[in-house]
Amino acid sequence: MVPGDASSVVSVNPAKPLISVCIPMYNNGATIERCLRSILEQEGVEFEIVVVDDDSSDDCAAIAATMLRPGDRLLRNEPRLGLNRNHNKCLEVARGGLIQFVHGDDRLLPGALQTLSRRFEDPSVGMAFAPRRVESDDIKWQQRYGRVHTRFRKLRDRNHGPSLVLQMVLHGAKENWIGEPTAVMFRRQLALDAGGFRTDIYQLVDVDFWLRLMLRSAVCFVPHELSVRRHTAATETTRVMATRRNVLDRQRILTWLIVDPLSPNSVRSAAALWWIPAWLAMIVEVAVLGPQRRTHLKALAPAPFREFAHARRQLPMAD
């Protein structure tokens, strides 16, 4: 297939594709062609591609424009929305009932869309995920985070979502046991009902999102790799960690799990048991390691009172 050659691509039904493959793109000029190629080569299922460029300063949008099929879309944000809001923009404009995010420096392996989408033939399934292959020069990071799903106990093809949530919360809800968005497919309406990606969580935004989806649905697991995640030091997570914008991430996740009306009592109790220890641990960590100790300690001090009121205001409205 030659990029830009309209005769070499197949158009997509723009009205109602089964899957919306969403690429929240930002300065991915070096990798976007490989990313899009991995999507365009998917077979056996109808899908649209929606690229939402977040005001990039490189040539990634121009590259993407030459590769998209008739019916695919390239949208550009001006000004930049930021990572979390750009993911929500993708959810907003998607037409498919199923959502597959693919980050601009990641790629899908052959058969990924067909394999994951089949799990949604069961209407109770709202989310499906698979292991991802990690490419990184950081051997220690790869060893620690390369096979995150193995932290689950008795992970099956089909799982009760709240039971998976409980396992994660019993261990503190501080690590991503699912993977990045490229490793996951989910129902668009479920994501909207759960409130989308929160914009007040920074490092653990994926963890928060997966937990809220799993509280609301059955979850399928495919036991073989279906995507490739490229990990580099120059990631948004690395930048967040350097500035400690994430000081309240874990408290906000635990608070949400306590107040969410769909949380079973077991999840609420586990989250409540972790709340004070996690809060005190972050206070000590900030006080010892910094940076911006005064600013972050000022944000942490009123958290036991402020965060519960904040979470209740953010809950999705009941029908």
Swiss-Prot record:
Location of the protein in the cell: Membrane
Keywords: Membrane, Transmembrane, Transmembrane helix
Any one cellular-component term (Gene Ontology): membrane
Pfam family, any one: Glycos_transf_2
Spans through the membrane: 270-290
Origin: domain of life: Bacteria
InterPro entries membership: Glyco_trans_2-like, Glycosyltransf_2, Nucleotide-diphossugar_trans
PANTHER family: GLYCOSYLTRANSFERASE, GLYCOSYLTRANSFERASE TAGX-RELATED
Name of the molecule in the record: Uncharacterized protein MT1568
Organism field: Mycobacterium tuberculosis (strain CDC 1551 / Oshkosh)
